[in-house]
Design a protein with these regions (language model features):
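Cytosolic regulatory regions built on CNB/CRP/Popeye-like sensor folds
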Residues: 1-180
Length: 180
């Protein structure tokens, strides 16, 4: 993947963006400044994958500019060809916390819809903050649990849509009136 350094984001802008997030919003100015200083900014082209489902990850991302799409491959599809849309990510959204905090492989693929500038925070950048303020992990855990819940709701909604489409197709095939 061709990450391009993005030098048009100032340290103050990075700090402000980090402060606006649910994960890092409760950090003090000094902690935000330290994290902003260590974090890198990259530019990604439209259609480019930022993370791929199944890969290991040791960083999380914050969207500075652009829109991204989250996809999850079904059990019977290839992870290089995401099959199911999950959600959009926009300015101030974060992603990648799950792989960063659990050491598990990425649970979804994230692809740029437009040109995107992202702040990348690596595990090694978080360690000093976690030692100083371990409750950050609780916040991240809450965010991850909420995302899992949303994903489950999306999956249930998708399954219901497929069920209704199948019933409608069967009704057409047998020329039966459709129930309202």
């Amino acid at each position: 993947q061709a990450k391009l350094p993005s030098s048009d984001i100032t340290l103050e802008q990075k700090q402000s963006l980090l402060a606006s997030t649910e994960i890092f919003g409760h950090l003090n100015e000094q902690q935000l400044a330290m994290l902003a200083d260590q974090a890198s900014c990259e530019t990604f082209a439209p259609g480019e994958s930022v993370v791929r489902q199944g890969e290991r990850g040791d960083s999380l991302y914050l969207v500075v500019r652009g829109t991204l799409e989250v996809f999850q491959a079904s059990a019977n599809s290839s992870t290089s060809h995401p099959s199911r849309y999950v959600s959009d990510l926009e300015v101030s959204d974060t992603f990648g916390e799950m792989a960063l905090c659990t050491g598990k492989a990425r649970s979804a693929s994230v692809i740029c819809k437009s040109e995107c500038i992202l702040i990348e925070i690596e595990r090694k950048h978080l360690l000093p903050l976690l030692e100083e303020q371990p409750e950050i992990l609780e916040t991240m855990g809450s965010i991850m649990a909420a995302r899992r819940q949303q994903l489950k709701a999306n999956q249930q909604q998708h399954a219901e849509s497929r069920r209704l489409a199948l019933i409608a197709r069967m009704q057409r095939l047998f020329s039966l009136p459709r129930g309202e």
